[in-house]
């Protein structure tokens, strides 16, 4: 006997509901992710490439590097890694207008002309982090002495010790994206901009740089600022992992770091690597040859040309303090960044260096919240972190990172220079961030 129509309809409806439920689970799992890369930094190993050991899903992967002979970037196993950012034109209200051709920023994805050099454009050229519904979650597990660490990078929150601090906005919300500048900051109509074909801003104090960045905000919104510490640490960790080395200049390129002058910097124009893809560098370093600029994750001059002022970390009377988010969800007790350290968290470390409070970085100090420069004695241009640390021993120092056009081998991703907020010079500038 045939089933009653109403029973057959009920059965069909139940089966369809089950199919829909399974599809929904698959979609959730796809968004949730399943990748956990890892690496360990061995503080006792002076060779910067031997100091990094792959863990978890990174085991067996081939490191990336710039081939200085062919002029091509060798991706190794990392070209399709989930954390790769995407170049875009970002409206001043924080929404994406359109994406750029990653191999030619003068074009949109569809091949038509972009606004990357248009100073009348109401927005900026930025890298969008967080793709395909997957954010970047990082967990830092310090060694017992806090001088080494295991670092894990995942496309989902594996446990509560994985954090996505760079994705937190001024309202304390965890969002899908955060944005970093493609170019060094330029000053156009009193706004700090990220556009191609521009001269870099110079001789501004930290407060002035922040005010120029915030001039991009629409109405009462608080999305735009200068570089942020938690962004920089995540990006530096990704660079260490991809290159399987702490020596970023050797892996990715020297940058514009040798024999620079104010005149050379003044003549530099952003956008020299618009057609060089996501990564590019040379092993020359001459600041007067602008095509020596380094490019990582689609961004020009992550080091070189100018020191880049960074918010979220300070040295206060010799001790490092920090803040990973605009709000207080990171455990800090003050909203917004400041130049006093009030409401910031203690990193638990006071840097040591030569009699001049400087030197090549030998040791970083790791906590679950970040990585902080510790020892600037015993390092060199080819050992440990291969980059420089300078700090003031009293008062408040605001970090400037990366190195400038006259830094030479001391420049790189691990370079930190803590200087008074009032400091201003031709070799120091800032770049935009947006959350």
What are the residue ranges of the model-derived segments?
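GGW-centered surface loops in extracellular recognition modules
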Residues: 28-128, 135-136, 224
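Acidic glycine-/aspartate-rich tracts in secreted/extracellular proteins
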Residues: 132-136, 184-187, 313-314, 435
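A short, polar/charged loop-to-alpha-helix boundary motif
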Residues: 316-327
């Amino acid at each position: 006997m045939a089933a009653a129509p109403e029973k057959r309809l009920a059965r069909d409806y139940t089966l369809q509901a089950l199919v829909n439920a399974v599809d929904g689970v698959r979609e959730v799992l796809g968004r949730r992710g399943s990748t956990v890369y890892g690496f360990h930094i061995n503080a006792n190993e002076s060779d910067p490439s031997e100091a990094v050991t792959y863990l978890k899903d990174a085991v067996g992967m081939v490191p990336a590097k710039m081939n200085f002979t062919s002029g091509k970037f060798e991706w190794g196993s990392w070209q399709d890694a989930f954390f790769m950012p995407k170049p875009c034109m970002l409206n001043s209200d924080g929404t994406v207008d359109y994406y750029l051709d990653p191999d030619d920023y003068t074009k949109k994805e569809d091949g038509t002309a972009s606004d990357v050099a248009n100073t009348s454009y109401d927005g900026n050229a930025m890298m969008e982090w967080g793709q395909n519904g997957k954010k970047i979650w990082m967990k830092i597990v310090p060694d017992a002495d806090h001088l080494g660490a295991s670092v894990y990078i995942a496309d989902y929150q594996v446990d509560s010790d994985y954090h996505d601090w760079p994705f937190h906005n001024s309202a304390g919300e965890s969002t899908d994206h955060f944005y970093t500048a493609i170019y060094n900051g330029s000053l156009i109509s009193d706004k700090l901009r990220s556009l191609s074909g521009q001269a870099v801003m110079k001789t501004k104090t930290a407060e002035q740089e922040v005010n120029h960045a915030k001039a991009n905000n629409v109405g009462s919104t608080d999305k735009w600022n200068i570089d942020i510490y938690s962004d920089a640490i995540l990006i530096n960790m990704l660079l260490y992992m991809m290159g399987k080395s702490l020596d970023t200049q050797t892996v990715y390129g020297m940058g514009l770091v040798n024999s620079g002058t104010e005149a050379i910097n003044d003549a530099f124009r952003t956008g020299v690597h618009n057609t060089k893809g996501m990564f590019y560098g040379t092993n020359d370093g001459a600041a007067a040859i602008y095509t020596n600029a380094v490019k990582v994750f689609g961004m020009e001059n992550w080091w070189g040309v100018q020191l880049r002022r960074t918010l979220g970390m300070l040295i206060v009377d010799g001790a490092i303090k920090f803040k990973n988010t605009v709000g207080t969800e990171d455990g800090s007790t003050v909203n917004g960044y400041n130049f006093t350290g009030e409401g910031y968290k203690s990193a638990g470390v006071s840097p040591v260096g030569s009699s001049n409070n400087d030197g090549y970085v030998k040791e970083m100090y790791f906590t679950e919240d970040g990585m902080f420069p510790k020892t600037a004695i015993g390092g060199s241009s080819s050992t440990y972190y291969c980059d420089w640390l300078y700090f003031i021993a009293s008062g408040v120092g605001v970090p400037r990172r990366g190195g400038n056009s006259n830094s030479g081998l001391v420049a790189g991703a691990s370079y930190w220079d803590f200087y008074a907020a009032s400091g201003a010079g031709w070799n120091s500038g800032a770049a935009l961030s947006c959350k």
